[in-house]
Amino acid sequence: MTVNTSSGGQITGWGIALGNNLITNHDLASRMDTSDEWIKERTGISERRIGGTTAGLAVQAAKDALKIADCSPDEIDLLVLATTTPDDQIPATSAMVQHLLGLKCGAMDLNAACSGFVYSLVTGFGM
């Protein structure tokens, strides 16, 4: 999938990463006064995955995105990492991701909660 914008920016790859530990509603119900049905009815959630660091998950997803885009790290102009759960406040998690991916471009964290993805796109396309 390629999305073109008037600024010339494109989305040419994407990636995903999930924590290794699976916690189901049944797991939660065995430890607290709730049930799978009660949680699903109110949230639509049946399971969640936890584990891993933000940087580790970001690197895993970024490697997938680079592969799908048939792109090398030296072709990246800017790394914008949208998160509300950084590994540390200082240094920015994006700096660790930048290092682990071998990127030579600038890198920045962006904390905008649920709208972080949209703000990251606008920031990247605006550069």
Residue ranges and their predicted role:
Residues 38-42, 46-56, 83-127:
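Conserved catalytic cysteine-centered active-site region
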